[in-house]
Every structure is written in structure tokens, then in C-alpha cells.
Amino acid sequence: MGTHDGYESAGELLRALAAPLRIAIVTELGGGARCVHELVEAVRAPQPLVSQHLRVLRGAGVVRGARRGREIEYSLTDEHIAHIVADAVSHAREPRRPARVAESPALSGDPASINPG
């Protein structure tokens, strides 16, 4: 197993989630399966736009659709995705802290500060 196993898949997942509306959709689906009209109401976006974003999420394997009568009900393929999104949203809502100065001489970027011996 290489050290980069899973990085490509993680990158694809994060790219699929890289839109505020898709984050909102995944957040809603974290609470359970929803039909398109329910998602439209919840995220307050036009139906064609919600459907377009659902296609992206379905193509990335984030959501799946199942027919429920005349409608398609969408759900997350993996509950971990809801946690990833919830953590990202929570982190984004935290107050920004100033960047920390490197604590280690090796991290400062100054080659003279690194003791080779």
C-alpha cells in the first residue's frame, strides 16, 4: 500500500462537494432520504438547479436515487459523508485565528536554522 492510497478518491469526493448548494443538499440528506421537491423547499433553490447538483452528486457516488411512486427519493450512499460535511461547515463557522508562526526551526523555511547533526 502506498502512502497516497485514497488521496485521489478523497480528492474526487471533495470536488463533488465543492459547491455551497451541494453542501446544503448533503446536509439535508444527512437527516434522511428526501424527494427533489423536499430538497427544493429545504435549500430554497429552483428545481432544475437542485436536479443538476443531484446529478453531480449521484455521478460521484455521493447520493443514490430510488423511485418512490412518481418521484425519486435521494439518500446518501454513506453516512460518513454527512459527518465530513458537518465538520467542514462547523469549521468554516469558527472565528478565524491568525496564522501561527512556525514553532520549529525546521518549519521556518530558513535552511540555516536546521541543525544537520
What annotation goes with each model-predicted range?
Residues 1-5, 9, 79-117:
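Amphipathic alpha-helical dimerization/coiled-coil segments
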Residues 2-48, 68, 72-80:
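N-terminal helix-turn-helix DNA-binding core of bacterial DNA-binding proteins
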Residues 13, 60, 70-72, 86-90:
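Short, structured secondary-structure boundary patches
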Residues 23, 49-51, 108, 114:
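A generic alpha-helix propensity feature with a strong bias for hydrophobic helices
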Residues 28, 56-59, 96, 100:
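Juxtamembrane/membrane-water interface recognition
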Residues 41, 52, 58-59:
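Alpha-helical residues within the helix-turn-helix
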